[in-house]
Amino acid sequence: IENERILEEDKQYFWFPLDGEKKLFTENLTPGKQVYKEKLLTKKGIEYRNWEPFRSKLAACIMNGLENFPFLAESNILYLGVSTGTTISHISDIVGPNGTIFGVEHSSRVARDFLDRVAVFRKNIIPIIQNAKKPDQYFSVFTKVDVVYVDIAQPDQTKIAIDNCKMF
């Protein structure tokens, strides 16, 4: 494994050696800040955050060869089910300061952690404390989005995803 970053073309994530293995990283939008005690790595003056596949389904997909990665710099994203903010924080790194993520979370207890640990430090995240089943009540979404990312576990999650896609 080389010691330099390897940029996956148009994907905005990086592979670096760490602890003798090839690990996944994103460039930290908020240098010096961790979200879930992930390892930070600085290369050539740029800070990167280790994206743990055991804490993020999206990271696990990338580690297993995900071919269609829709998140790009400056994208507008609707993220359903942000939970405590692990995955959305890495997507925030990827879309950068000119992208926007509308992060929907229904559970007020989980949302409190997300707000305190992630959203307050990341200006490109707009938190929405609302039920993903009611997209007509997201008053903070002010534009059409490029991607709807669904990270919820509901029996009717397909209907929820389709309803959100139709609205935004």
Q: For each of these PLM feature ranges, what is it?
A:
Residues 1-48:
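N-terminal auxiliary segments of SAM/dcSAM-dependent transferases
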Residues 31, 35-38, 52-76:
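Conserved alpha-helix/loop element of class I SAM-dependent methyltransferases that forms part
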Residues 62, 81, 148:
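Residue-level signature of catalytic and energy-coupling elements of molecular machines
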Residues 71-85, 101-102:
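Conserved class I S-adenosyl-L-methionine
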Residues 83-97:
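Conserved SAM-binding loop of SAM-dependent methyltransferases across substrates and taxa
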Residues 92-96, 160-168:
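A short glycine-rich, Lys/Arg-flanked "PGG" loop and its adjoining helix->strand segment in the class I
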Residues 102-145, 149, 153-157:
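S-adenosyl-L-methionine
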